[in-house]
Regions:
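Core catalytic machinery and nucleic-acid-binding channels of phosphodiester-processing enzymes
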Residues: 1-10, 37, 327, 332
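Acidic, metal-ligating active-site segments
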Residues: 1-28, 100, 374
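Short interface patches used for recognition in eukaryotic signaling and trafficking proteins
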Residues: 20-33, 164, 281-289, 319-327, ...
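Well-ordered, non-membrane alpha-helical segments in soluble/globular domains
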Residues: 35-43, 121, 125, 362, ...
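Generic, well-ordered alpha-helical scaffold segments in large soluble proteins
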Residues: 38-41, 45, 49, 98-101, ...
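Domain-level detector for long, ordered catalytic/regulatory cores in large eukaryotic signaling
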Residues: 39, 47-332, 454-459
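Short glycine-rich, low-complexity/disordered patches
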Residues: 51-68, 383-394, 401-413
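Amphipathic alpha-helical/coiled-coil segments positioned at domain termini
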Residues: 76-126, 317-380, 400-459
Length: 459
């Protein structure tokens, strides 16, 4: 779909002002190869209007010169990477904005990151296209995270600065959804629950094995001590001993055996692992995953049910966390974190007897809500962008400490670039996927009787 950015936001996304330039054929989404076949005719059409030409209008019957350029690419993350020529989020070099790799996903020092450059990406894409074998192309894309896309044929299009990170999928259905369902455990995915149960069982078995090994080791120490008590150690002439060596005795043997380190090592760890720079320590469940208590969850549900909200705001499910209410919609996540949770969460984690952990949970929630209010606003400034980065980096630092069972996801890294995007494009909700998803819903509800070529959608 094409939108006219010359129109103000309240008119820009109306159906009558939206041009549906094409519909991907069913039943499957195009892959990175076939997407180029769909983009080629679109890019050829856009290239014709790159040079100014005259168009007669009501106000200018003799014609007015216009130029058409397709600049910001707005899509969900999967489609965005395919269309812009970057690799998927599972790749080693998964980010379209910087050169961070998967093993650096927890890095919060954004000043140390090496950002991508549009011209460099275009050159890398040309090298990929000029490679003559599939093996060579695979090697190129693994080393750069870039492949060719038809949009590179547009000379003005910047693959880095003209790619917009979708506010809907990245933040609302990414960061907020992950915090609610995964970190807080409200409606946690069955796979995540099973993974935690498996890890907990593995930890219990490991602790049992270590305990048994420690008992056996203690028995061996006792047997060695009893056996050494019967040894007769003859004295040696004084001149045959090294100058700094103490005279051996049963006491020396006993004390050495009693001071033998008995701290157990995990059976999955090797002594040399600690000196391996690539070593990743095994996951520890000393602190169980966070879950709200039953009374806290009831308080949250009561707040959802009794809070007064505007008539145009849809109330989230009052049985939040129960699988029976189905999947939450994007606007429900936004309502929860901007209107409902700020009223009830402080009552759960703030008080004279609040523990240090609860204080950190509340501080983490504060940073998340502050970042959400900024990124969801329809106004933006450089100061707001900097404030967003402060709150978001603080939030990520806290979730790394409070929720060690759940590593960061690519979405968390992508959101680190929202500050720069706000400085470049302004308010991100004005360039979000909400409007495109609404049109998708309209198209999906159109009855074609499985004869798309004979329906009005072809005109």
């Amino acid at each position: 779909m094409l939108y006219c950015l010359n129109l103000p936001p309240h008119l820009r996304y109306r159906p009558e002002n939206t041009f549906i330039i094409g519909i991907t054929p069913a039943p499957h989404a195009p892959n990175p190869t076939t997407i180029s076949h769909l983009l080629d005719p679109i890019v050829e059409s856009l290239a014709k209007y790159n040079i100014s030409f005259s168009v007669p209008t009501f106000g200018y019957p003799t014609g007015i010169p216009i130029t058409v350029k397709a600049v910001p690419l707005i899509a969900d993350l999967e489609a965005n990477n395919k269309v812009s020529g970057f690799l998927a989020h599972a790749a080693i070099m998964y980010c379209s904005f910087c050169l961070s790799t998967q093993d650096q996903i927890e890095d919060l020092d954004i000043q140390s990151w090496q950002m991508r450059n549009g011209q460099t990406v275009r050159d890398q894409a040309m090298e990929w296209r000029n490679s003559t074998t599939k093996t060579a192309r695979t090697a190129k894309e693994k080393s750069t995270g870039v492949r060719w896309t038809s949009l590179h044929s547009l000379p003005y299009w910047d693959p880095v600065n003209h790619t917009v990170l979708g506010f809907l999928h990245n933040w609302v259905e990414g960061v907020l959804k992950n915090h609610l369902r995964t970190l807080w455990g409200i409606g946690r995915d069955e796979k995540e629950e099973q993974k935690l149960k498996d890890l907990e069982l593995e930890e219990q078995l490991t602790n049992t094995d270590v305990s048994d090994s420690a008992s056996e080791l203690e028995e061996l120490h006792q047997e060695a001590a009893e056996h050494s008590a019967h040894w007769h150690i003859p004295s040696m002439p004084e001149g045959m001993l090294p100058p700094d060596s103490p005279t051996p005795s049963v006491t020396t043997l006993d004390s050495s055996s009693s001071t033998t380190p008995t701290q157990p090592l995990s059976p999955d760890m090797d002594v040399d692992d600690h000196y391996d720079p690539d070593f990743i320590p095994p996951l520890s469940l000393d602190t169980p995953p966070f879950d709200f208590s039953e009374s806290q969850l009831l308080s949250i549900r009561d707040c959802i049910q009794n809070i007064t909200i505007p008539t145009w705001v849809q109330r989230p499910p009052v049985n939040l966390g129960d699988p029976s209410h189905g999947k939450l919609k994007a606007h429900e996540y936004l309502t929860l974190f901007t209107s409902i949770f700020p009223l009830i969460i402080p009552e759960l984690w703030y008080g004279p007897n609040t523990s240090r952990t609860d204080q950190e949970h509340l501080q983490c929630f504060h940073h998340l809500v502050s970042a959400t209010n900024i990124i969801a606003s329809f106004t933006a400034s450089f100061k707001k962008a900097d404030d967003y980065m402060h709150h978001y980096i603080s939030y990520r630092a806290l979730i790394q400490r409070l929720y060690p069972h759940f590593p960061s996801k690519p979405n968390h890294h992508y959101a680190m670039h929202n500050g720069d995007l706000m400085k470049w494009w302004g308010p991100l909700p004005c360039l979000s996927e909400f409007f495109g998803e609404r049109v998708n819903g309209m198209l999906q509800s159109t009855n074609t009787n499985q004869r798309l070529s004979r329906s009005l959608l072809q005109h």
